[in-house]
Every structure is written in structure tokens, then in C-alpha cells.
Amino acid sequence: MITIAQRCSSAKVSVNKTIVSEIKSGLLLLVGVQIGDKQIDIKKTVDKISNLRIFDDEKGKMNLSILDTKGSLLVVSQFTLCGDIKKGRRPSFVNAESPSLSLKIYENLMENFRQLGIKTLGGVFGEMMKVELVNEGPATFIINSKEL
């Protein structure tokens, strides 16, 4: 599982010009589910993101986690993160999990965050979405569950 975590002061997802999810302070997570991702990948990703100290404390030092700040998550499925661009000029998505399995893993990921008490909203799986955010910092992190 590949996740791009972007610290934000606000983020929202729209489908057909209608806002479907919106958060204030927290993280926008773009998530790509790869073939072979399992419950352990979800656990590692949730563990890392929920405890990652990437929010400023009162001294301006990155020292607080999403749990500490009581921030929100906006989780958006993005299979293009699994794209392979090594050969040719068009990405190959053979490493992306099937839509049906990806949906289950995506929903499970969000539920795991909710079980920790983190307000977690999502995009609309499989839909063409417009994602907007105000990136704070900017602070953007790449998390690959296979490297944790």
C-alpha cells in the first residue's frame, strides 16, 4: 500500500460539482492499494500515520501526531499511485489491486482509523473526483507499507 500523506489546514472532495467530504485541520491521504496488500499492510499504515509526529507543537517543532492534535483524515483512493513508469511513456497499472478488493481494503483502512477515534472521511471510490487542499508547510510524506 502506497500512501501520500499531506498535512493540511483544509481539504475537500467533490463529485459532479458537489462536495462529498470536507475536513479542516488534519491529513489528506491519497491511497494506492497494490496487488498482495493484506491486513498487515493496513495495520502498518494505520500505525505509522496515526503516530507520525508531523504536526507542530507550541514551539513550532514537528512533535505531535494526528491523535495528539485531534485532527481529521480525508482518505481518497488513488490507484495511479501504483503506476509503473519505468518503461515507455504510458504508465502501467498491473501492480494495482482489482477494484473489488481495493474497495474492501480502502474501507477497512478507514475503519481502522475510526477505531482509534480519528474522525475519518472518504472520497467516493471509483469516481472521478476533484480534490482540493490547503497544504500546510507544505508537509507531504510518502508511506509504503512494504518498507515499514
Predicted segments, located by residue:
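N-terminal, polar/charged subdomain of small-to-medium soluble alpha/beta proteins
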Residues: 1-89, 104-148
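A charged helix-plus-loop insertion that forms the helical arch/lid used to bind
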Residues: 86-98
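Acidic/glycine-rich phosphate/pyrophosphate-binding loops and surrounding catalytic core
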Residues: 101
